[in-house]
Amino acid sequence: MKIGIVGCLGRMGRIIVQEVVGTGGVELSGGVVRRGNGLVGEDMGAVLGCGHGAKITDSKEFLFDCSDVVIDFSSPECMLECVGIASEKRVPLVSGTTGVDERDFRTHAEKVPLLWSCNMSLGVTLLLELVKMAAAGFRGYDVEIRELHHRAKKDAPSGTSLMLGKAVAQGMGVELESQQHTFGSGCRRSGAVGFSVARGGGVIGDHAVMFLGDDEIVELQHRAIDRRVFARGAIKAACWLVGKPAGLYTMSDVLRA
């Protein structure tokens, strides 16, 4: 199976390339970088020190033409372009790009299998299921979602925190917007869902969901200690997605397989 990488020289892209090279049954078809990058045309494996054979290109269309499935970790603008190309060429796409919305995928998912998740970790995927169960059982408890990331992370709350918030709301049987507590908005009403965000150091990702009752606190937590967990999840998702009917999938579908 040939896997193409969009954003192959980015922080996550480099790790995914290395993991694909070390995974049996799959091979790199190529990688996309921004137009004007001086490495266009170079051997991707040679540049990253992990094998040979796949070229770096600035043409997304070319990458999709030579791939069985494409993995995207880029920018929202680049991701939207990739979704359109995937739909046109009927090539499955796995995207871990944040700062976008499920609605950006819906129309194209009628033509091609797409999988999008703000977090490719199977551990976080399982945490989402546990949070739904806990929220259904702890109705009336206050909920606080805490996150800590490296100093360079731009979006806040993170995409993962928002997924956890939606999981809480689903467990409660409500819409997140109706239950969300905004810091500084006054006293907290019973059962509200709040978000606490911290940035600093080189923390990869630390998320916790606290269910706060009057006489007990229950906390569910996930801590990423190596970015490879996201790369391995993305590769697993890519292998799973090939051959699936058109539609929009999540890591929960992969976990249940």
Swiss-Prot record:
Question: Where in the cell does this protein reside?
Answer: Cytoplasm
**Record's SUPFAM superfamilies?**
Glyceraldehyde-3-phosphate dehydrogenase-like, C-terminal domain, NAD(P)-binding Rossmann-fold domains
Pathway membership, UniProt = Amino-acid biosynthesis; L-lysine biosynthesis via DAP pathway; (S)-tetrahydrodipicolinate from L-aspartate: step 4/4
* Keyword line: Amino-acid biosynthesis, Cytoplasm, Diaminopimelate biosynthesis, Lysine biosynthesis, NAD, NADP, Oxidoreductase
* Reaction equations catalysed: (S)-2,3,4,5-tetrahydrodipicolinate + NAD(+) + H2O = (2S,4S)-4-hydroxy-2,3,4,5-tetrahydrodipicolinate + NADH + H(+); (S)-2,3,4,5-tetrahydrodipicolinate + NADP(+) + H2O = (2S,4S)-4-hydroxy-2,3,4,5-tetrahydrodipicolinate + NADPH + H(+)
Q: Which GO terms describe its biological process?
A: diaminopimelate biosynthetic process; lysine biosynthetic process via diaminopimelate
EC numbers: 1.17.1.8
The positions flagged as active site in the entry are H149 (proton donor/acceptor), K153 (proton donor)
List the GO terms this entry assigns under cellular component, sorted alphabetically.
cytoplasm
The residues that hold NADP(+) are: R34
Q: Which domain of life is it from?
A: Bacteria
Residues engaged in binding NAD(+) = G7, C8, L9, G10, R11, M12, G96, T97, T98, S117, C118, N119, M120
Which parts of the sequence bind (S)-2,3,4,5-tetrahydrodipicolinate? H150, G159, T160
In which broad location class does this protein mainly occur, judging by the first location in its UniProt entry? cytoplasm
Q: Name one GO molecular function term.
A: 4-hydroxy-tetrahydrodipicolinate reductase
The main enzyme category here is: oxidoreductase
Q: Give the UniProt family note.
A: Belongs to the DapB family.
Cited function: Catalyzes the conversion of 4-hydroxy-tetrahydrodipicolinate (HTPA) to tetrahydrodipicolinate.
Designated name of the protein: 4-hydroxy-tetrahydrodipicolinate reductase
Which organism is this protein's natural source? Anaplasma marginale (strain St. Maries)
Q: Name the gene.
A: dapB
